[in-house]
């Protein structure tokens, strides 16, 4: 089984979405079940409704999953496994106060060294811990040897015992920590591959260590994706609007175009424009670059326009939420618009834009009055010829006011292109 494990603590960002897409693709390629595991153990930070929002986004992107589970439902399993390690002497009760630990951290900072747990409580026996009757956290004992694994993207990685350290697996209120819950759940659901961001690299040896001490011997593969940088070359954060999947969708980027771009980002692909189903056929995690990739909104706009151009007029009408027959108009405006939002603005201008211009006020009025009573011919050439004759206007004094009257704008596609698409609405829009 392959899993995508988001936390319901905020809006989904493009880094999360990329992880979801890659996990979905690998599940399809390997013919494995795709699990959504909502990691809701951080109760204080959970935001109500964010889990449903995440699932809705996955649906929007066509990432079909087989099951949804909540990590908090497995608390009893996490606790039992933690007490098992405690009873076997592979973990210990730690009574160190937050103040004591902070003092140790400050000391490490002064000495310019990485903080490591002092080991103060490591030799307290289970009997002694029980007799004290005080709250305690459970810490797993640090490994005795190097923890090594092969990352599909990063290659061979090794972590010394001190880097893994004796870390907390169960809080004083008996809730599991992130790493412990994650390691146990990957065992419970028989996860075979974990794809996630490289900010989790330091968590991986801890999770391997937990499973080793629990006697789990099934191999789990790992692939840690490099971070996505913003246009200034810094790590993308919530301050970057484009990092929010919700914002991208609201701006009129298509789910299929966003997916296309995220698969393309820092990857070797046989072509630039493709669908999710096409990517499943050739996608290979080994082709992902180890280096961070820079997010380029202009590149996304280019890809989005390509996907819009591939849509039929009917599909465009549905995506834009416009009346039947306006797909042809949308197709024409794709020469100068790259998103659904921009297309809607262009179409709205044609249908509802102000037909006013001080320079050509008289000409606009003349043309408007003629068009109200004129029977519109099929071809633009006939239309232009008849209107020129009836109005007595020509050149700039004809074409400029005609464009303003028909489109609500001084610039845009050729009127000969636009005419067939708006002919049936001309009398309506010039009012």
Swiss-Prot record:
Pfam families: Anticodon_2 (PF19269), tRNA-synt_1c (PF00749)
Name by which UniProt lists this protein: Glutamate--tRNA ligase 1
Single GO biological process annotation from the record: glutamyl-tRNA aminoacylation
Subunit composition and interactions: Monomer.
PROSITE patterns: AA_TRNA_LIGASE_I
Source species of the chain: Nitratiruptor sp. (strain SB155-2)
Reactions catalysed, as given in the entry: tRNA(Glu) + L-glutamate + ATP = L-glutamyl-tRNA(Glu) + AMP + diphosphate
Record EC number: 6.1.1.17
Its job: Catalyzes the attachment of glutamate to tRNA(Glu) in a two-step reaction: glutamate is first activated by ATP to form Glu-AMP and then transferred to the acceptor end of tRNA(Glu).
Compartments, as annotated in UniProt: Cytoplasm
Gene name per UniProt: gltX1
Keywords: Aminoacyl-tRNA synthetase, ATP-binding, Cytoplasm, Ligase, Nucleotide-binding, Protein biosynthesis
Residues holding ATP: 238
Motif segment ('KMSKS' region): 235-239
GO molecular function: ATP binding; glutamate-tRNA ligase activity; tRNA binding
GO cellular component: cytosol
Sequence motif 'HIGH' region, residues: 6-16
UniProt similarity note: Belongs to the class-I aminoacyl-tRNA synthetase family. Glutamate--tRNA ligase type 1 subfamily.
